Protein backbone atom coordinates (compact mmCIF):
# COMPACT_ATOMS: atom_id res chain seq x y z
CA UNK A 1 0.00 0.00 0.00
CA UNK A 2 1.16 3.52 -0.78
CA UNK A 3 1.68 5.95 2.08
CA UNK A 4 -1.33 8.06 3.02
CA UNK A 5 -1.53 11.71 4.01
CA UNK A 6 -1.88 11.44 7.78
CA UNK A 7 -3.57 14.46 9.40
CA UNK A 8 -3.40 13.00 12.93
CA UNK A 9 -2.98 15.42 15.84
CA UNK A 10 -0.41 13.10 17.44
CA UNK A 11 1.35 10.78 17.14
CA UNK A 12 1.64 12.40 13.76
CA UNK A 13 3.35 12.41 10.41
CA UNK A 14 7.15 12.15 10.34
CA UNK A 15 9.32 13.30 7.41
CA UNK A 16 9.68 10.45 4.91
CA UNK A 17 13.49 10.90 4.60
CA UNK A 18 13.71 10.43 8.38
CA UNK A 19 11.68 7.21 8.29
CA UNK A 20 13.82 5.91 5.44
CA UNK A 21 17.01 6.66 7.36
CA UNK A 22 15.60 4.92 10.45
CA UNK A 23 14.77 1.92 8.27
CA UNK A 24 18.28 1.87 6.82
CA UNK A 25 19.99 2.11 10.23
CA UNK A 26 17.52 0.02 12.22
CA UNK A 27 19.36 -3.31 12.34
CA UNK A 28 22.95 -2.07 12.26
CA UNK A 29 23.54 1.48 13.50
CA UNK A 30 26.71 3.11 12.24
CA UNK A 31 28.61 -0.17 11.89
CA UNK A 32 28.04 -1.20 15.53
CA UNK A 33 26.30 -4.45 14.56
CA UNK A 34 23.28 -3.55 16.70
CA UNK A 35 20.19 -1.36 16.69
CA UNK A 36 19.82 1.87 18.64
CA UNK A 37 17.02 0.07 20.47
CA UNK A 38 19.55 -2.48 21.78
CA UNK A 39 22.30 -0.01 22.64
CA UNK A 40 23.33 0.96 26.18
CA UNK A 41 22.39 4.52 27.02
CA UNK A 42 25.81 4.76 28.71
CA UNK A 43 27.65 4.02 25.44
CA UNK A 44 29.69 6.65 23.62
CA UNK A 45 27.45 6.15 20.57
CA UNK A 46 24.32 7.11 22.45
CA UNK A 47 26.11 9.92 24.28
CA UNK A 48 26.91 11.50 20.91
CA UNK A 49 23.26 11.09 19.78
CA UNK A 50 21.80 12.87 22.83
CA UNK A 51 24.50 15.58 22.67
CA UNK A 52 23.82 16.21 18.97
CA UNK A 53 20.06 16.34 19.54
CA UNK A 54 20.53 18.95 22.26
CA UNK A 55 22.92 21.09 20.23
CA UNK A 56 20.67 20.94 17.13
CA UNK A 57 17.67 22.08 19.19
CA UNK A 58 19.77 24.93 20.64
CA UNK A 59 20.84 25.99 17.17
CA UNK A 60 17.38 25.79 15.57
CA UNK A 61 15.61 27.62 18.41
CA UNK A 62 18.51 29.97 19.20
CA UNK A 63 18.43 28.89 22.86
CA UNK A 64 20.61 31.11 25.09
CA UNK A 65 23.38 29.56 27.21
CA UNK A 66 21.55 30.18 30.49
CA UNK A 67 18.94 27.56 29.54
CA UNK A 68 19.14 23.79 29.97
CA UNK A 69 17.70 21.37 27.41
CA UNK A 70 16.31 18.30 29.17
CA UNK A 71 15.10 15.03 27.64
CA UNK A 72 12.26 13.67 29.78
CA UNK A 73 9.42 11.14 29.71
CA UNK A 74 5.75 11.19 30.70
CA UNK A 75 4.50 13.53 27.98
CA UNK A 76 3.39 17.13 28.43
CA UNK A 77 0.80 15.74 30.87
CA UNK A 78 3.50 14.89 33.43
CA UNK A 79 4.89 18.41 33.04
CA UNK A 80 1.52 19.68 34.31
CA UNK A 81 2.64 18.28 37.70
CA UNK A 82 6.42 18.70 37.44
CA UNK A 83 6.19 22.43 36.80
CA UNK A 84 4.34 23.37 40.02
CA UNK A 85 6.40 20.85 42.03
CA UNK A 86 9.61 22.55 40.86
CA UNK A 87 8.67 26.18 40.30
CA UNK A 88 5.74 26.97 42.62
CA UNK A 89 8.08 27.47 45.57
CA UNK A 90 8.10 31.13 46.70
CA UNK A 91 4.49 32.35 46.79
CA UNK A 92 2.93 28.89 46.33
CA UNK A 93 0.77 30.53 43.70
CA UNK A 94 0.76 30.52 39.88
CA UNK A 95 -1.24 32.23 37.15
CA UNK A 96 -2.88 30.28 34.34
CA UNK A 97 -4.38 31.58 31.10
CA UNK A 98 -7.04 29.16 29.88
CA UNK A 99 -7.29 28.83 26.11
CA UNK A 100 -8.29 25.18 25.66
CA UNK A 101 -8.59 21.69 27.08
CA UNK A 102 -4.85 21.25 27.67
CA UNK A 103 -4.30 24.52 29.54
CA UNK A 104 -7.29 23.61 31.71
CA UNK A 105 -5.77 20.20 32.52
CA UNK A 106 -2.45 21.88 33.33
CA UNK A 107 -4.24 24.22 35.75
CA UNK A 108 -6.10 21.35 37.43
CA UNK A 109 -2.80 19.59 38.22
CA UNK A 110 -1.26 22.81 39.58
CA UNK A 111 -4.24 23.22 41.94
CA UNK A 112 -3.10 20.02 43.68
CA UNK A 113 0.25 21.64 44.54
CA UNK A 114 -0.62 25.25 45.38
CA UNK A 115 -2.94 28.16 44.69
CA UNK A 116 -3.94 28.98 41.12
CA UNK A 117 -5.14 32.31 39.77
CA UNK A 118 -7.00 32.20 36.45
CA UNK A 119 -5.68 35.36 34.83
CA UNK A 120 -7.91 35.12 31.76
CA UNK A 121 -10.03 32.51 30.00
CA UNK A 122 -11.81 32.07 26.68
CA UNK A 123 -13.93 29.17 27.94
CA UNK A 124 -17.15 31.19 27.63
CA UNK A 125 -16.35 31.52 23.91
CA UNK A 126 -15.84 27.72 23.74
CA UNK A 127 -12.09 28.37 23.40
CA UNK A 128 -12.51 29.66 19.83
CA UNK A 129 -10.36 32.73 20.59
CA UNK A 130 -7.42 33.88 22.74
CA UNK A 131 -8.40 36.26 25.59
CA UNK A 132 -7.09 39.82 25.62
CA UNK A 133 -4.55 40.35 28.38
CA UNK A 134 -4.29 44.14 28.57
CA UNK A 135 -3.23 45.06 32.10
CA UNK A 136 -4.00 41.60 33.51
CA UNK A 137 -0.41 40.51 34.18
CA UNK A 138 0.49 43.01 36.90
CA UNK A 139 0.46 40.66 39.92
CA UNK A 140 4.08 39.95 40.77
CA UNK A 141 3.23 37.65 43.69
CA UNK A 142 3.11 34.66 41.37
CA UNK A 143 5.76 31.99 40.94
CA UNK A 144 5.02 31.74 37.22
CA UNK A 145 2.42 32.39 34.52
CA UNK A 146 1.43 29.44 32.31
CA UNK A 147 0.22 29.59 28.70
CA UNK A 148 -0.40 27.07 25.91
CA UNK A 149 1.01 28.63 22.74
CA UNK A 150 -1.08 26.51 20.35
CA UNK A 151 -4.34 24.77 21.19
CA UNK A 152 -4.31 21.44 19.39
CA UNK A 153 -7.97 20.59 19.93
CA UNK A 154 -9.56 24.00 19.37
CA UNK A 155 -7.24 25.26 16.61
CA UNK A 156 -6.13 28.59 18.10
CA UNK A 157 -2.72 30.10 18.81
CA UNK A 158 -1.22 33.17 20.43
CA UNK A 159 -0.37 35.85 17.88
CA UNK A 160 1.62 37.82 20.46
CA UNK A 161 3.31 36.22 23.44
CA UNK A 162 2.20 37.88 26.71
CA UNK A 163 4.81 40.23 28.14
CA UNK A 164 5.61 39.31 31.74
CA UNK A 165 8.25 41.40 33.48
CA UNK A 166 9.16 39.84 36.80
CA UNK A 167 7.38 36.49 36.69
CA UNK A 168 8.69 33.48 34.69
CA UNK A 169 6.52 32.67 31.66
CA UNK A 170 5.95 28.93 31.24
CA UNK A 171 4.73 27.65 27.86
CA UNK A 172 3.32 24.36 26.65
CA UNK A 173 4.50 24.29 23.01
CA UNK A 174 3.63 20.64 22.36
CA UNK A 175 1.81 21.22 19.09
CA UNK A 176 3.75 24.12 17.58
CA UNK A 177 7.36 23.91 18.77
CA UNK A 178 9.72 24.56 15.82
CA UNK A 179 6.80 25.54 13.56
CA UNK A 180 7.45 29.27 13.89
CA UNK A 181 10.08 31.50 15.45
CA UNK A 182 9.92 32.27 19.16
CA UNK A 183 12.27 34.35 21.28
CA UNK A 184 13.23 31.77 23.91
CA UNK A 185 14.53 34.51 26.24
CA UNK A 186 10.91 35.63 26.82
CA UNK A 187 10.21 32.34 28.61
CA UNK A 188 11.37 30.82 31.87
CA UNK A 189 10.37 27.32 30.77
CA UNK A 190 9.18 25.76 27.50
CA UNK A 191 8.00 22.18 27.29
CA UNK A 192 6.66 19.91 24.56
CA UNK A 193 5.68 16.31 24.01
CA UNK A 194 7.65 15.15 20.97
CA UNK A 195 4.89 13.26 19.15
CA UNK A 196 3.43 16.18 17.21
CA UNK A 197 6.24 18.24 15.71
CA UNK A 198 9.48 16.76 17.06
CA UNK A 199 9.59 13.00 16.76
CA UNK A 200 7.89 9.81 17.95
CA UNK A 201 5.91 9.35 21.16
CA UNK A 202 7.78 8.67 24.39
CA UNK A 203 9.97 11.78 24.58
CA UNK A 204 9.27 15.13 26.23
CA UNK A 205 11.54 18.14 25.80
CA UNK A 206 11.95 20.84 28.45
CA UNK A 207 13.92 24.05 27.92
CA UNK A 208 14.45 25.64 31.33
CA UNK A 209 16.24 28.73 32.56
CA UNK A 210 18.90 27.49 34.97
CA UNK A 211 17.74 29.70 37.85
CA UNK A 212 14.42 27.80 37.87
CA UNK A 213 16.20 24.49 38.55
CA UNK A 214 16.99 23.39 42.10
CA UNK A 215 14.12 25.02 43.98
CA UNK A 216 11.90 21.97 44.38
CA UNK A 217 10.73 21.02 47.85
CA UNK A 218 12.67 18.20 49.52
CA UNK A 219 9.53 16.06 49.33
CA UNK A 220 9.57 16.25 45.50
CA UNK A 221 10.18 12.73 44.11
CA UNK A 222 13.60 12.30 42.48
CA UNK A 223 12.16 11.50 39.06
CA UNK A 224 9.94 14.61 39.13
CA UNK A 225 12.79 16.99 40.00
CA UNK A 226 14.36 18.89 37.09
CA UNK A 227 17.65 18.97 39.00
CA UNK A 228 17.92 15.17 38.67
CA UNK A 229 17.99 15.47 34.88
CA UNK A 230 20.09 18.63 34.80
CA UNK A 231 22.88 17.10 36.91
CA UNK A 232 22.92 13.87 34.90
CA UNK A 233 22.69 15.12 31.29
CA UNK A 234 19.16 13.59 31.14
CA UNK A 235 20.75 10.16 31.77
CA UNK A 236 19.88 9.59 35.45
CA UNK A 237 17.93 6.53 34.35
CA UNK A 238 17.36 4.93 30.94
CA UNK A 239 15.96 7.62 28.64
CA UNK A 240 13.62 6.97 25.67
CA UNK A 241 16.71 6.36 23.55
CA UNK A 242 15.04 5.42 20.26
CA UNK A 243 12.72 8.45 20.42
CA UNK A 244 15.72 10.72 21.08
CA UNK A 245 17.54 9.22 18.07
CA UNK A 246 14.56 9.76 15.74
CA UNK A 247 14.08 13.29 17.09
CA UNK A 248 17.74 14.02 16.28
CA UNK A 249 17.06 12.92 12.68
CA UNK A 250 13.96 15.16 12.53
CA UNK A 251 16.06 18.12 13.76
CA UNK A 252 18.68 17.37 11.08
CA UNK A 253 15.90 17.28 8.48
CA UNK A 254 14.52 20.59 9.75
CA UNK A 255 17.96 22.17 9.46
CA UNK A 256 18.21 20.91 5.87
CA UNK A 257 14.87 22.61 5.08
CA UNK A 258 16.44 25.95 6.03
CA UNK A 259 15.62 26.01 9.74
CA UNK A 260 12.64 27.43 11.61
CA UNK A 261 12.22 30.63 9.57
CA UNK A 262 11.99 28.62 6.33
CA UNK A 263 9.59 26.07 7.82
CA UNK A 264 7.43 28.90 9.25
CA UNK A 265 7.08 30.37 5.76
CA UNK A 266 6.10 26.93 4.47
CA UNK A 267 3.60 26.48 7.33
CA UNK A 268 1.96 29.85 6.65
CA UNK A 269 1.60 28.94 2.99
CA UNK A 270 0.13 25.49 3.79
CA UNK A 271 -2.40 26.82 6.33
CA UNK A 272 -3.42 29.62 3.93
CA UNK A 273 -4.36 27.03 1.29
CA UNK A 274 -6.91 25.56 3.67
CA UNK A 275 -8.09 28.77 5.36
CA UNK A 276 -8.59 30.56 2.03
CA UNK A 277 -10.83 27.73 0.87
CA UNK A 278 -12.77 27.65 4.17
CA UNK A 279 -13.38 31.41 3.98
CA UNK A 280 -14.97 31.05 0.53
CA UNK A 281 -16.82 27.78 1.15
CA UNK A 282 -20.61 27.64 1.41
CA UNK A 283 -20.53 24.14 2.93
CA UNK A 284 -17.55 24.04 5.29
CA UNK A 285 -17.06 26.43 8.20
CA UNK A 286 -14.32 26.94 10.79
CA UNK A 287 -15.35 27.97 14.32
CA UNK A 288 -12.09 29.79 15.13
CA UNK A 289 -11.66 33.57 15.49
CA UNK A 290 -9.64 34.39 12.32
CA UNK A 291 -7.17 36.54 14.30
CA UNK A 292 -5.98 33.55 16.33
CA UNK A 293 -6.00 30.75 13.76
CA UNK A 294 -3.46 27.99 14.33
CA UNK A 295 -0.89 27.19 11.65
CA UNK A 296 -0.84 23.57 12.83
CA UNK A 297 -4.37 22.39 13.73
CA UNK A 298 -7.34 23.46 11.63
CA UNK A 299 -10.85 22.42 12.75
CA UNK A 300 -13.76 22.62 10.31
CA UNK A 301 -17.24 21.17 9.91
CA UNK A 302 -20.24 20.80 7.61
CA UNK A 303 -23.84 21.61 8.66
CA UNK A 304 -24.65 18.00 9.64
CA UNK A 305 -23.21 14.91 11.31
CA UNK A 306 -24.28 12.82 8.32
CA UNK A 307 -22.22 14.95 5.93
CA UNK A 308 -19.27 14.90 8.33
CA UNK A 309 -19.35 11.08 8.42
CA UNK A 310 -19.65 10.84 4.64
CA UNK A 311 -16.78 13.31 4.20
CA UNK A 312 -14.50 11.35 6.53
CA UNK A 313 -15.29 8.00 4.89
CA UNK A 314 -14.64 9.26 1.36
CA UNK A 315 -11.49 11.09 2.50
CA UNK A 316 -10.13 7.81 3.87
CA UNK A 317 -10.79 6.11 0.54
CA UNK A 318 -8.62 8.80 -1.08
CA UNK A 319 -5.73 8.32 1.32
CA UNK A 320 -6.56 11.39 3.46
CA UNK A 321 -6.73 9.89 6.94
CA UNK A 322 -7.21 10.78 10.64
CA UNK A 323 -9.30 13.87 9.88
CA UNK A 324 -11.94 13.26 12.56
CA UNK A 325 -12.16 16.17 15.00
CA UNK A 326 -11.61 15.79 18.74
CA UNK A 327 -14.68 14.42 20.51
CA UNK A 328 -15.06 17.66 22.51
CA UNK A 329 -15.32 19.77 19.34
CA UNK A 330 -16.68 17.39 16.69
CA UNK A 331 -16.48 17.81 12.94
CA UNK A 332 -13.07 17.50 11.32
CA UNK A 333 -9.55 18.64 12.10
CA UNK A 334 -6.54 18.74 9.81
CA UNK A 335 -3.24 18.73 11.69
CA UNK A 336 -0.62 19.97 9.23
CA UNK A 337 2.62 19.83 11.18
CA UNK A 338 6.09 20.58 9.78
CA UNK A 339 6.38 17.16 8.13
CA UNK A 340 3.09 17.47 6.18
CA UNK A 341 4.01 18.33 2.58
CA UNK A 342 2.14 21.15 0.83
CA UNK A 343 0.94 18.53 -1.66
CA UNK A 344 -0.98 16.80 1.16
CA UNK A 345 -2.84 20.01 2.05
CA UNK A 346 -3.56 20.71 -1.63
CA UNK A 347 -4.99 17.20 -2.06
CA UNK A 348 -7.26 17.80 0.94
CA UNK A 349 -8.47 21.14 -0.45
CA UNK A 350 -9.10 19.58 -3.88
CA UNK A 351 -11.20 16.85 -2.26
CA UNK A 352 -13.13 19.40 -0.15
CA UNK A 353 -13.96 21.36 -3.32
CA UNK A 354 -15.27 18.20 -5.00
CA UNK A 355 -17.27 17.23 -1.92
CA UNK A 356 -18.85 20.68 -1.80
CA UNK A 357 -19.90 20.49 -5.46
CA UNK A 358 -21.52 17.10 -4.82
CA UNK A 359 -23.43 18.37 -1.77
CA UNK A 360 -24.71 21.77 -2.74
From Swiss-Prot:
GO cellular component: cytoplasm
PROSITE patterns xrefs: AA_TRANSFER_CLASS_5
Chief location of this protein within or outside the cell: cytoplasm
Annotated L-glutamate binding sites: 42
Listed EC numbers: 2.6.1.52
Cofactor: pyridoxal 5'-phosphate
Intracellular or extracellular location(s): Cytoplasm
Pathway in which the depicted protein is active: Amino-acid biosynthesis; L-serine biosynthesis; L-serine from 3-phospho-D-glycerate: step 2/3
GO BP annotations, alphabetical order: L-serine biosynthetic process
Residues noted as binding pyridoxal 5'-phosphate in the record, renumbered to the chain: 76-77, 102, 152, 172, 195, 237-238
Cofactor note: Binds 1 pyridoxal phosphate per subunit.
One Gene Ontology term of the molecular function aspect: O-phospho-L-serine:2-oxoglutarate aminotransferase activity
Enzyme class: transferase
Assembly behavior: Homodimer.
Listed name of the protein: Phosphoserine aminotransferase
Organism field: Bacillus cereus (strain ATCC 10987 / NRS 248)
Organism classification: Bacteria, Bacillati, Bacillota, Bacilli, Bacillales
Gene name of the record: serC
